[in-house]
Swiss-Prot record:
Domain commentary: The EIIC domain forms the PTS system translocation channel and contains the specific substrate-binding site.
Protein's cellular compartments: Cell inner membrane
Database matches in Pfam families: PTS_EIIC
Name the record gives this protein: Phosphotransferase IIC component GlvC
Amino acid sequence: MLSQIQRFGGAMFTPVLLFPFAGIVVGLAILLQNPMFVGESLTDPNSLFAQIVHIIEEGGWTVFRNMPLIFAVGLPIGLAKQAQGRACLAVMVSFLTWNYFINAMGMTWGSYFGVDFTQDAVAGSGLTMMAGIKTLDTSIIGAIIISGIVTALHNRLFDKKLPVFLGIFQGTSYVVIIAFLVMIPCAWLTLLGWPKVQMGIESLQAFLRSAGALGVWVYTFLERILIPTGLHHFIYGQFIFGPAAVEGGIQMYWAQHLQEFSLSAEPLKSLFPEGGFALHGNSKIFGAVGISLAMYFTAAPENRVKVAGLLIPATLTAMLVGITEPLEFTFLFISPLLFAVHAVLAASMSTVMYLFGVVGNMGGGLID
């Protein structure tokens, strides 16, 4: 069992290695679009500099916007017993097939499943765009499950001998054919169960709003612990960008009333208590350093230079722009238990700050 867990962790580490460079590109691009750093003239949308930076930034988002697909394809590299390249191909085709089935079933029988597939795939909708397919947002959890199923089929069926007249379907084609049939009930079960999980998360909003400091703790804890599932969007999305806390979302409300807050002699917490739900970014700034140092000093001495090369860009990305996936996914696969401890500490940090009267729009990194 331990060896299988280690193999799984090693397989998941392959896509994680793609995050640091992508994070650096996005972080630098965001910096270069900030007028405080480069001046107003260079950040003008009509300037050649701003246009080039925007193009580079879009390329940098590739890994982050396609995380489920990348994790799905990355799993067979470590878990397929043979023909890893062919296993990756089978997983990619099957994962996309699963999402197409979800889309088709959702569009056809959406009312039965309680999912509105006609709405836009935005944060809080429960939907996402995956390789151009509107589908349920199951994040890397769905990707890992489907990839694991197809990889298991590959390990069992890739070498299976078929009759001579069916020889053209032997190998990868046979795996994909069987996986095609398996993806139908998988898509059905996903549509049947996942929206209920999403609705359960949404129902927490009323409790979070009315629970004061406890609500801030639970909010921040769930926002961190649910990152691997994609369900964290249901936690922060409606608070930061939607009307769960204030009309228009905390981010817009903060920008609109910032001058009013600065002129008032009242404590900021009494003026804007809802700002306690936007303190989760502080763990990205301060917690990232602790996570990185822990991984560095627990690494074997001969590997510390390599580990530092991975951790430094990931940590800077988390601290500056609040993109924590490169660091937290590495952390998650190394020690899931400590990732849960990290979520507890992040929640406790936000709650203590809130109790001391600190509120505001602090959901991102230092630049935010």
